[in-house]
Amino acid sequence: MKTLADALKEFEVLSFEIDEQALAFDVDNIEMVIEKSDITPVPKSRHFVEGVINLRGRIIPVVNLAKILGISFDEQKMKSIIVARTKDVEVGFLVDRVLGVLRITENQLDLTNVSDKFGKKSKGLVKTDGRLIIYLDIDKIIEEITVKEGV
């Protein structure tokens, strides 16, 4: 039987892949996951901005998460958009595919820095089912992409 302390040490993440690299976001910031649809390009936008989508009357910028993280990707494999919100900013992250929601305990989380490559964009590594998942800090990523010029 779980104690209250055990329950407090659990949290959920949405896991997904880019170029066979497993990554995850906190589910608290995820609004929905949709299939990649028609993305309207925006002239003179930043290199990681793929364009915008109209989602039920809301215009949402879509960014290529692989470009933000500096990892390889195959544009043909990018089939899903993770729509996320922090504070008043709503962004769609283009990824290969969503794997699902995982319930994680604190003892599965390695808070050591993943690498200099991800810096503050990563909260650490999640160890689950013999696989390592890079646990991303969605707040830091959205802050980084909106702080200078906006998406």
Swiss-Prot record:
Any one biological process term the GO annotation gives: chemotaxis
UniProt protein name: Chemotaxis protein CheW
Domain of life: Bacteria
Keywords: Chemotaxis, Cytoplasm
Domain CheW-like: 10-147
Cytoplasm found in the keyword field: yes
Protein species of origin: Thermotoga maritima (strain ATCC 43589 / DSM 3109 / JCM 10099 / NBRC 100826 / MSB8)
Function statement: Involved in the transmission of sensory signals from the chemoreceptors to the flagellar motors.
Cellular localization per UniProt: Cytoplasm
A GO molecular function held by the record: protein domain specific binding
Any Pfam family: CheW
GO cellular component, one term: cytosol
Signal peptide: none
